[in-house]
Amino acid sequence: MKNSEHENEYQKAYSEFIKINFSEKILNKIPSIKMPTPTANGVTASVIKYCTFRGWHAERVNVTGRQKYDHKQKKMVWIKTNSRRGSADIHAIIEGKAVMIEVKVGKDRMSDKQKEYAESVRRAGGEYHIIHSFDDFYNYLKSKNLLTI
């Protein structure tokens, strides 16, 4: 099966990243990379990896908090996050610009807090994008002339 345009871009960015970061002696031993699955986690991972390949900064933001075992209570307890409610899934700096990316797959929709957050980012001069697939992210990059191909 032939790769799509965005898969070719992903592969090319990965190849360039490998050439820059690894010695020539081991280049042929590094496996090729496959596109992650089209789930919310897969799309998020592919965007973050692609940004890393390109030398941009990108990080996943967890706003749900975490679980921790409480030895006194002898049970798992929920620890609230310090992140702002409604924060985007991915915070990135792409070519010097703050870009917040919300990943929505399937029937997932934005909450009111997420809409407020998006407006706050835009008012501050940042970019906020909602993507449903890596293809959406690819199209954003294409519209900004930020592709390697």
Name these PLM-found stretches.
Residues M1-I149:
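Catalytic phosphate/metal-binding cores of nucleic-acid and nucleotide-processing enzymes, i.e., regions
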